[in-house]
């Protein structure tokens, strides 16, 4: 019982091998069947999803407010890995495949370096580096599954070389094609069977184009039977990096290490050309004009600085002259005020002396003043008595 189960499990784990293909279109058909089988398997898993809904149907959109929240099954706690033997979570059957979070509608093979076949303009499916090699020149079929990872890596490198244009150099015959298979177009006769991409075969034909009609005929026959792999099959969004190349015979401007020191150099000093470099007069003329413009700007800046300094000096000198005049006026006023103060002091002293003399005079004659007062008092009394009598 146990041995039979082990044998069954071993048979199930064995991969299903496919017989080697004898035509060049077999890899494309195998690759084109991969996405269809995956889609059919996904449909088989969730083909009866409407009969296993765990929640009641949602009300129409008009009766509830719009909310970005998904269904309540996402609110609860979910296991990262459910225990062994438990059924899957009910949200698997909640929505149809691609119903809630639909994947962008991208056809398989629409982007480079994908495991699916890339569509070509002539209608033939074209794999991007994961198909097995076809029959070689000696007639021996190659094992596609054993060489699959190697060819995939080589295919990516080959496609990268096709993009950056490293394999377009004339005179260098690359042995490996874009998908990793060796090109046998030169050794094949008039069979019409060839493998690999036509990018390297075209390079080989361009480099070996020296009058050999046999090799040219074999390469043309191979390209007629095999799928074309020229630059037209690349995606439209791929752009070839173009590096600017200077024209030969036109020297560039000489390197000058004293560019920053020109500001501190004397007037009219122009940096000389580097020794050993021949500079054309037409090429050096713009640089001379630039240096002249810089010198002119420097001189203008210096002149403006001088003018501003001179104006500031004149303004300060005028201010100093004005202050000196005001100081002289103030000194004259001060001297006049001092003279007036001295005059007032002398007058004050005179008044003090007069006051003291008057005081002495009043203090020396007090009796005379008293007798006069008594006489004046007696006379009104006599007049009053006479009036009464």
Swiss-Prot record:
SMART domains: BRLZ (SM00338). Keywords: Activator, Disulfide bond, DNA-binding, Isopeptide bond, Nucleus, Transcription, Transcription regulation, Ubl conjugation. The keyword Transcription regulation applies. Residues 323-358 are annotated as: Leucine-zipper. Residues 356-366 have a biased composition (Polar residues). Pfam families: bZIP_1 (PF00170), MFMR (PF07777), MFMR_assoc (PF16596). PROSITE patterns: BZIP (PS50217), BZIP_BASIC (PS00036). GO terms for molecular function: DNA-binding transcription factor activity; identical protein binding; sequence-specific DNA binding; transcription cis-regulatory region binding. Its main location: nucleus. One of its GO terms (cellular component) is nucleus. This is bZIP transcription factor 68. The lineage of its organism: Eukaryota, Viridiplantae, Streptophyta, Embryophyta, Tracheophyta. The gene is BZIP68.
